[in-house]
């Protein structure tokens, strides 16, 4: 059984695209066409955040360190 309830992806030529991943606990990650994954502020547990990053890495080939650095820069929690 997977942690994520849905993966939604919208992609069109000559327009911006955005992908998002929602977990069963309500937390989510989103990624624009010109950015790396940006996590939301409602992190129920550190373990859930780590699992989310691992799942994103498997699907779009992001490194965990790049995702962690990006979440600090995205401004979602500020």
UniProtKB/Swiss-Prot annotation:
One Gene Ontology biological process: sorocarp development
Q: Which Pfam families does the entry mention?
A: Coiled
What residue ranges carry the coiled-coil annotation? Answer: none
Q: Which InterPro entries match?
A: HssA/B-like_chaperone, HssA/B-related
Region spans: Disordered: 1-32
Protein family per UniProt: Belongs to the hssA/B family.
Recorded hits in PANTHER family, A to Z, give: HSSA/B-LIKE PROTEIN 1-RELATED-RELATED, HSSA_B-LIKE PROTEIN 1-RELATED
> Under which name does UniProt file this protein?
HssA/B-like protein 30
Provide the species name. Answer: Dictyostelium discoideum (Social amoeba)
What lineage, starting at the top, does this entry show?
Eukaryota, Amoebozoa, Evosea, Eumycetozoa, Dictyostelia
Tell me the name of the encoding gene.
Answer: hssl30
């Amino acid at each position: 059984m997977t942690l994520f309830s849905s993966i939604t992806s919208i992609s069109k030529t000559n327009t911006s695209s955005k992908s998002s991943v929602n977990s069963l606990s309500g937390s989510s990650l989103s990624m624009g066409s010109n950015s790396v994954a940006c996590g939301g502020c409602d992190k129920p547990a550190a373990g859930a955040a780590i699992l989310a990053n691992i799942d994103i890495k498997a699907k779009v080939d992001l490194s965990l360190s790049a995702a962690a650095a990006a979440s600090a820069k995205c401004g979602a929690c500020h």
